[in-house]
Amino acid sequence: INGEGWLGDDANFIAAKMIAAFELIHKKGAKTALTAYYTPSGVQKIEMREWLQKFVPQDMKDGVDYLFVSYYEDDNGGFAPDWSEIFTDLQSTFPASKLGIGECGNTAASATQASKKAMMRRYYTMPRYAKNYVGGYFWWYFVQDCVSGAGPGASNGENRGARDKAKATDEL
């Protein structure tokens, strides 16, 4: 939600759309999820946690069912965040939300099978950082990286669930 340039440059307008979507879905009794984009300090004009504090209203902080964090190490010079600190802080801000990693992946053009496997293992075996931490670990290029015969142009929507993720990780 807070990645600069994805949804436009007007944070207030982006927040208004987020709030409207939350209210509509929440009113219907459906599950709600919010994915925030993490970057190291100084990469974006406003850091993820500051954006969430400033633009997410309290009723949404208390009511969103899932809060996921999207992060790509390759896009951030290999920076490894302190996930314990991040998820502990998010748990205090979103006390009723289930927390997890919403997107991750080895995106570098130079990524090897070994680097993908190591990164996937690191994310898929992350400990439970906070009381409501549920994991997540949506590997963005799962089909391309883990489904036999799927090339680099394969759609993430194809063959969804075709293979067990743990088995595919072992075979990567």
Annotated model-derived regions:
Residues 47, 57-58, 135, 165:
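Helix N-terminus capping/helix-initiation residues
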Residues 1-11, 33-38, 137-141:
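Active-site groove signature of glycoside hydrolases
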